[in-house]
Amino acid sequence: MAGGRPRPPRGFRDFPPEVMILRKRLLSRLERVFESYGFDPLDTPAVEYWETLSGKYGEEAESRLIWRFQDPWSGRWYALRYDLTVPLARFVASNPGLPMPFKRYHIGKVWRHEEPQKGRYREFVQCDADIVGSPYPEADAEIVSLAVDSIDALGLPGFRVRVNDRRLLAGVFEEELGFDNPLPIYRAIDKLDKIGVEGVRRELERLGLPGSTVERIMEIISWRGRPGEVLESVRRGYGSNEKVREALDHLEEMLSLADDKRVELDMSLVRGLDYYTGPILEVVLDEPRIGSVAGGGRYDGLVGMFAGRDIPATGVSIGIERIIDAGLELGVYSLDVKTVAQVAVVVLDRRYYRYAWEAARILRRGGLNVRIDLSRASGQVQRRKASRLGIPVLAFVGAKEAEGGFLTLYSAAKGERVAVPLGEAVKAVERLLPS
């Protein structure tokens, strides 16, 4: 603090009411989309045993990005959730009686020891939807369709859905370059958006690959376009490879269902986490360029690491933090709404406060959000506070209102003032509210 105002740690944020109102509105839209596909809500602890997360994400995440700590009493190591997928896998393994396929959505905070920058924080909310128990392309198609519908519901213009398949790349690399372990290559390629083409080239060279091999990799990952065209080209060149053939058949069936002009096949897409095994996807905005706003894919081996048997799974994570940042920058979202209150009961005469209190109770029971003076301020001050917060309807209570059993309602936006009996006040307020 050092003499200044107290503030949260670097990479962590406070969300004042106007921000939380926007966040809640957007998250409720996502919940509606998830539930429209029949996904059920789930929550898991913010803290997991370290051994639950260890060995699931890859070296960089586990050595640098996961927040972990030791219990000073038991000596056992714990970690904050790095994502919502590994906890899901642990949950499924812990509950073997779940009906399959198990479709869940989970909206919750995760923590990563990232270097804070635009669109990247150390504490943020993920919005995940996953299908556990189906190995078929239909499940992956539903995930792609859900991702498209989610971004549409959030009102963002100009986005693309990039898809690929880990097996497709593995098979092409196997045929072209003889790789039997492409994971180090994937990790280098995954940095393309962060470090650019030349940066990836240098990363590949650091792996000790010959220059000709590096150039061939760079050429392969430049293949992108309409899925049908790219897949047909790959089938002609590498269709004899078993991994390529499996991936092509799966992708073609998946994309025949999830048919959207915004979907493209991009061979540079690998997704950095080690647990992906098949189709993968990312959603990127045309503007602003802030990285992916959603991503996911198939991870058929992860649940089995806990359950001791193969259980297929696929899913997507929507990055609400980047979406909000992008929407504010584009002007799609605003922070104009400062309060959830729809009505301010303005008490003009303290002698009739009990009547004002009863009026507020009736309005609340009618489903309205109501504020009433709690600081014994003058009527003028109450009006000023309500105006500053942007509360759309004022309900005045003075001697004539209390003695006559009515309220005087006023809407500045509509320029309308009306006196209504207390029993009709709810409907009258609803008519005055902005549509």
Swiss-Prot record:
> What GO biological process terms are annotated to this protein in UniProt?
histidyl-tRNA aminoacylation
What PROSITE patterns does the database record attribute to this sequence? AA_TRNA_LIGASE_II (PS50862)
What is any one of the record's Gene Ontology cellular component terms?
Answer: cytosol
- Compartment annotation: Cytoplasm
Which keywords belong to this entry? Aminoacyl-tRNA synthetase, ATP-binding, Cytoplasm, Ligase, Nucleotide-binding, Protein biosynthesis
Is Iron among this UniProt entry's keywords? no
Does the entry feature the keyword Acyltransferase, yes or no? no
Q: Give the EC number.
A: 6.1.1.21
Matching entries from CDD domains are given as: HisRS-like_core
Catalysis: reaction(s) = tRNA(His) + L-histidine + ATP = L-histidyl-tRNA(His) + AMP + diphosphate + H(+)
Q: Which InterPro entries match?
A: aa-tRNA-synth_II, aa-tRNA-synth_II/BPL/LPL, Anticodon-bd, Anticodon-bd_dom_sf, His-tRNA-ligase, HisRS-like_core, HisRS/HisZ
Q: Which residues cross the membrane?
A: none
What broad class describes the main subcellular location of this protein?
cytoplasm
Q: Which domain of life is it from?
A: Archaea
User: Which Gene Ontology MF annotations are present?
Assistant: ATP binding; histidine-tRNA ligase activity; RNA binding
Family from the record: Belongs to the class-II aminoacyl-tRNA synthetase family.
PANTHER family noted in UniProt: HISTIDINE--TRNA LIGASE, HISTIDYL-TRNA SYNTHETASE
Q: This protein is called what? A: Histidine--tRNA ligase
Which organism encodes this protein?
Aeropyrum pernix (strain ATCC 700893 / DSM 11879 / JCM 9820 / NBRC 100138 / K1)
Traced from the root, the source organism's taxonomic lineage reads: Archaea, Thermoproteota, Thermoprotei, Desulfurococcales, Desulfurococcaceae
Q: Which gene encodes it?
A: hisS
